[in-house]
Amino acid sequence: MHPVLRQMRPPPQQRQEQEQRQTCRAPSPPPTASGGATSAVDAAADGDYEPPRRRARHYLDLEEGEGLARLGAPSPERYPRVQLKRDTREAYVPRQNLFRDREGEEPEEMRDRKFHAGRELRHGLNRERLLREEDFEPDARTGISPARAHVAAADLVTAYEQTVNQEINFQKSFNNHVRTLVAREEVAIGLMHLWDFVSALEQNPNSKPLMAQLFLIVQHSRDNEAFRDALLNIVEPEGRWLLDLINILQSIVVQERSLSLADKVAAINYSMLSLGKFYARKIYHTPYVPIDKEVKIEGFYMRMALKVLTLSDDLGVYRNERIHKAVSVSRRRELSDRELMHSLQRALAGTGSGDREAESYFDAGADLRWAPSRRALEAAGAGPGLAVAPARAGNVGGVEEYDEDDEYEPEDGEY
């Protein structure tokens, strides 16, 4: 039944209640004009009677409308949009990756065979074929029905396409991460220091200062245990691969300064591809290596390259440069009126003196330090030729040091 017609029917619970009331109710004689009115009156007196038009309006109010108007639906299965979605939904295709799914459960080289089979079947598969009942009858020669062969071929093609899409996404993600890291200046500086450090450690593996620095560097890599172990054993044979990787990345990122950013990303990808092929052939002792194993080794080197670049970014932040912080004028304390008048008086008194003495008033906050005037020193008994010292230098000529808590009284002629 169409969902629009299905929602016109009363809910199942109400239908059951109506059927129970009808079965429990005693059979009545054939309705007459007076009898129909009497039965309606009796039903109304019992409280079970509801006019058909009102009952239909009640059912329609529950399931008609949009959004919140449908909250009165008895169950999610009877919700109109849920029914439409269920009737028109497409078949769910689970995600598959022939290279990485079901680790350790596939026979050797079976992933490689499935991948190449899906690639070859992709061109000859009829995607619009509709299976009929006669297609499920087994063939007399092969014992396999055409429908079974078509479904198996479709599964291989689907697995191949999904595997290719996932590997494309992985490669795009790697390129974006490498491009972002290589574009940072800190990565080049940190990679240069890291390469210099591992080269010095390789020449002098028993140096205690270098080993102490190694432990400090290892503290920056806390996510990947394989990378930490290789970094701790970088001078040993089992950590030689990491030393080669650092040398390759250093030659691309640090040495080749004339390369563009896109060329550096391409060079790093080519290096990962070459390293993956080399070590895959070294493992299998043959030029032929299953493509799934080669892809896994390349993926391992890609992750390790990202670890090296991220570590270089962390190390490049530590620079021996002096940081100058610009302090805004608004963050300084405002001069009070008393300090402003003192500074003005000192500036006026210093007019005509040497430039060096005039500049010293405003250097390093000198304008905020009070010093007694020449007239005050003469009145106190000090000689006119006595140099005026700052208040922090102690008492000068028997005059006590000025305290900020003391109230300032202007002298004669001062305003």
From Swiss-Prot:
GO BP annotations listed: viral DNA genome packaging; viral release from host cell
Site positions for Cleavage: 351-352
Location of this chain's protein in the cell: Host nucleus
Feature: compositional bias, Low complexity: 381-394
InterPro entries according to UniProt: ADV_PKG3 (IPR037536), L1-like (IPR004292)
Chain residue ranges for the region called Disordered: 1-55, 381-415
Source organism, top-level taxon: Viruses
Biased composition (Acidic residues): 400-415
An example Gene Ontology CC term for this record: host cell nucleus
Modified residues (Phosphoserine): 75, 360
Family the UniProt entry places it in: Belongs to the adenoviridae packaging protein 3 family.
HAMAP family associated with the record: ADV_PKG3 (MF_04058)
Additional note from the record: All late proteins expressed from the major late promoter are produced by alternative splicing and alternative polyadenylation of the same gene giving rise to non-overlapping ORFs. A leader sequence is present in the N-terminus of all these mRNAs and is recognized by the viral shutoff protein to provide expression although conventional translation via ribosome scanning from the cap has been shut off in the host cell.
SUBUNIT field: Part of the genome packaging complex composed of packaging proteins 1, 2 and 3; this complex specifically binds to the packaging sequence on the left end of viral genomic DNA and performs packaging of the viral genome. Interacts with hexon-linking protein IIIa; this interaction is required to promote correct genome packaging.
Name used for this protein in its record: Packaging protein 3
Organism listed in the record: Human adenovirus C serotype 5 (HAdV-5)
